[in-house]
Amino acid sequence: MSTSAAPGKLATTLGANVSSLASKVRSTSSTQQSLMQSVKRIIPPLSSAKHKGQAGRIGIVGGSRDYTGAPFFASMSSMRFGCDMSYTICTPEAGNVIKTYSPDLIVNRLLDASVEWSQVERSVDELFARFHAVVIGPGLGRDEFMQKCAKLCIGLARKHDMYLVVDADGLWLLQNEPDLIKGYKKAILTPNVAEFGRLCDTLGIDCKQEPDSAAKKLAQALEGPTVLEKGPVDRITNGKEVLYVDLQGGLKRCGGQGDVLAGCLGTLAGWAKIYQDENPTLPARSTTTDGDLIAEDRLLLLAGYAASVTARTCSRLAFAKSKRAMLADDLLPEVGRAYEELWGDVQALL
């Protein structure tokens, strides 16, 4: 009797486990669908009634003597994803090169070490007043002058209450001076594995602990900024909630893919600013679900999620065509295709 009961119990147990697994799968799928719908609510609809710039004016701070490709990829990605205007702010020698890449680029060669610092401050401040969001880091470099420029730009972003993305060598500055960004809730940082480890070391966090805990503790230590930790699984956290992106991307790990993500994130951050301006009564905080209005503390969380999903989709589409020969430049034509695959045809928003 016991032998006949055992298979029945086993079947019951297996059935319960399968049911539980199916429930988790449905829950995950439901969560993803909910996140995607929330992101759509931030995207400004296209309209013939709008004028140039109303769908986003984004600044990209980067481009130095040694690096001209990164700001190009970030600027082009921001426009391909949907912002109206993208401005590259760089050194004169980098600007001369970047200008030749595309007539669509607006290149401001304001980071000039040969002029008075007060002139640099004034020129950048005047330009920042136009932006919805700014990305600091692609092609920035680590020399003293460029790091000084990054410090200036972070301060100006805070002065103008602007949404801010800090990437690449902008994170090098923050690992040395984390107080520059502490407490600023309109910032999102995009560290890769090495950059995440250095930031954790600076702030006294064990980066080898359970991954969710490490990411949340870094965001908590920064007291406001959102963190998009890039890796095999991307984690986006504001210190309270953690979102995950594990979509399959391309298998080629060529340089420049992070710049594509940063550019898309810049546009999404700009759209978050537009959404906030159009809805001045946004709640400051929310639960993990979005009501009639998306709470302010979830805007960059959703932007980071959307940028990660988009970058991985671009990489997958580009890799399917180019395989081992894939370069970052191959991702640019895929940004618009990724947008439509993820967020739907543009006509659906008209």
From Swiss-Prot:
What GO molecular-function term can you cite, just one? ATP binding
The EC code for this enzyme is 4.2.1.93
Alphabetized UniProt keyword annotations: ATP-binding, Cytoplasm, Lyase, NAD, NADP, Nucleotide-binding, Phosphoprotein
Question: Where is it predominantly found?
Answer: cytoplasm
Q: Which GO terms describe its biological process?
A: metabolite repair; nicotinamide nucleotide metabolic process
Name of the molecule in the record: ATP-dependent (S)-NAD(P)H-hydrate dehydratase
Q: Which GO terms describe its cellular component?
A: cytoplasm
Broad EC category: lyase
Stated family: Belongs to the NnrD/CARKD family.
Give its localization. Answer: Cytoplasm
Question: Where on this chain does ATP bind?
Answer: 230-234, 249-258
The cofactors it requires, by name, are:
Mg(2+)
- Highest taxon listed in the record's lineage: Eukaryota
- Which reactions appear under catalytic activity for this entry? (6S)-NADHX + ATP = ADP + phosphate + NADH + H(+); (6S)-NADPHX + ATP = ADP + phosphate + NADPH + H(+)
Organism in which the protein naturally occurs: Mycosarcoma maydis
Which residues are in the YjeF C-terminal domain?
A: 35-342
Task of the protein = Catalyzes the dehydration of the S-form of NAD(P)HX at the expense of ATP, which is converted to ADP. Together with NAD(P)HX epimerase, which catalyzes the epimerization of the S- and R-forms, the enzyme allows the repair of both epimers of NAD(P)HX, a damaged form of NAD(P)H that is a result of enzymatic or heat-dependent hydration.
Entry-linked InterPro entries: Carbohydrate_kinase_pred_CS, CARKD, Ribokinase-like
What the entry lists under Gene3D superfamilies is as follows:
3.40.1190.20
